[in-house]
Amino acid sequence: MLVAHSYGGAVMTNVAADAGEIVGLVYVAGFAPEPGESAFTLAGMFPGSTLGDAVHPVPRSDGKTDLYIDPDRFHSQFCADIPAEQAARMAATQRPATAEALYEPSGERPLWREVPSWFVFGELDRNIPAELEHYMAKRARARRVIEIPGASHAVSVAHPEATAHLILEAASLQVTA
């Protein structure tokens, strides 16, 4: 069972089906692209993502660009449903994504076409809007979709029990299948 959050969903989608005994995918507020789609392409498909306005680009010496969420906007953008002190720690320790990775088109064989998937995400996610999550879950024929009312992009931080429950449910269904 593979589990991924946010951009990690795009990475997980492109794991080769023959890479091992993968029995399912759990997308935790994650991207599930079709061939040729990128995370940024998907983020713009439906209204509600304000990530582009909240990202701070930092040029690297190799010519690539790291993207950070502006620390002043991190709480409202990424994790509005957790305490401000916790959000400040998360903002200070965030790891960047490269712009190149977020614009990279997905591969030709999405794993969600070959193994079952489950989705959990927040109703108020400002990075990957709930409408987009529903769209991706529908085309992936997700076995179960959980939208958590009032939850942000950091759904696994603010709602760890619900997130863990879905992961355990998915794993137990696959073990008994």
Show the residue positions of the predicted features.
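Gly/Ala-rich beta-loop-alpha elbow adjacent to hydrolase catalytic centers
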Residues: V3-A4, G8, M12
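Flexible "cap/lid" loop of the alpha/beta hydrolase fold
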Residues: A17-I22, V26-D62, P71, T98-L102
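Conserved strand-to-loop "acid loop" that flanks and positions the catalytic carboxylate
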Residues: L25, P116-D125
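Helix-loop "lid/cap" segments that line or gate small-molecule binding pockets
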Residues: I69-D81
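Active-site nucleophile elbow and catalytic-triad environment of alpha/beta-hydrolase enzymes
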Residues: A92-L111, V115
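Short, proline-enriched alpha-helix->beta-strand connector loops that line the catalytic pocket
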Residues: W112-S117, A140-R143
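Conserved loop-alpha-helix segment in the C-terminal half of the alpha/beta-hydrolase fold
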Residues: E123-A151, V157, E169
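Short, amphipathic alpha-helical "lid/cap" segments that border enzyme active or binding sites
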Residues: P160-L168
